[in-house]
Amino acid sequence: MEKPKYKRIVLKLSGEALAGEQGNGINPTVIQSIAKQVKEIAELEVEVAVVVGGGNLWRGKTGSDLGMDRATADYMGMLATVMNSLALQDSLETLGIQSRVQTSIEMRQVAEPYIRRKAIRHLEKKRVVIFAAGTGNPYFSTDTTAALRAAEIEADVILMAKNNVDGVYNADPRKDESAVKYESLSYLDVLKDGLEVMDSTASSLCMDNDIPLIVFSIMEEGNIKRAVIGESIGTIVRGK
């Protein structure tokens, strides 16, 4: 059995990753594939926490751009992440992996409220913990949620699984054929050069708490495990 490099991780999934090629909604085949990859690392005795975005169902910024109150639009986005989290939980439990959804906004009929000590206890019992509803506050992204929860639970690394790119580039590789992929970066590089890794709030939080970040593609099956056992994939961001 491969030896994992990291004991406790936060896996950040974009909402789009759950939509697959259809671009929106929840694709059952894709979410089952992701659940199988999570099962692989759970079987290595890695403690797994997951933060899921909601962009496949709703984006707060889009609503705001269309004239909605920004806070209302963001709360709708938080509810979208709960839907995604419940779908992922169902897929994991179909595969026999015990999991818990914890929400930043209380909705006790469908999930536990977020309690840090309880989340850590679940992880110690090798249950997958899915953090839903963002930070519970408008104006904060799910990237910031991943950084915040990683700091709170003292995760060893954040694995940022992308569905449309396999690392961090100096330009958009979909538009610029000469774009170069970085093997490694510092958070100061990300902030200084305005690289689209995660928003500046999330990057600053990771930098201040010395949490490394690996950006990689979720589209190639087995990549989550490769990242966990320390294979060189994607781009690693760390330090100042």
Curated annotation (Swiss-Prot):
Keywords: Allosteric enzyme, ATP-binding, Cytoplasm, Kinase, Nucleotide-binding, Pyrimidine biosynthesis, Transferase. Gene3D superfamilies: Acetylglutamate kinase-like. It is found in: Cytoplasm. It is an enzyme of class 2 (transferase). Allosterically activated by GTP. Can also be activated by dGTP and 3'-anthraniloyl-2'-deoxyguanosine-5'-triphosphate (Ant-dGTP). Inhibited by UTP, 5-bromo-UTP and 5-iodo-UTP. InterPro entries: AceGlu_kinase-like_sf, Asp/Glu/Uridylate_kinase, Uridylate_kinase, Uridylate_kinase_bac. This is Uridylate kinase. Disulfide bonds: none annotated. ATP binds at K12, L13, S14, G15, G55, R59, N163, Y169, D172. One of its GO terms (biological process) is 'de novo' CTP biosynthetic process. One of its GO terms (molecular function) is UMP kinase activity. Pathway: Pyrimidine metabolism; CTP biosynthesis via de novo pathway; UDP from UMP (UMPK route): step 1/1.
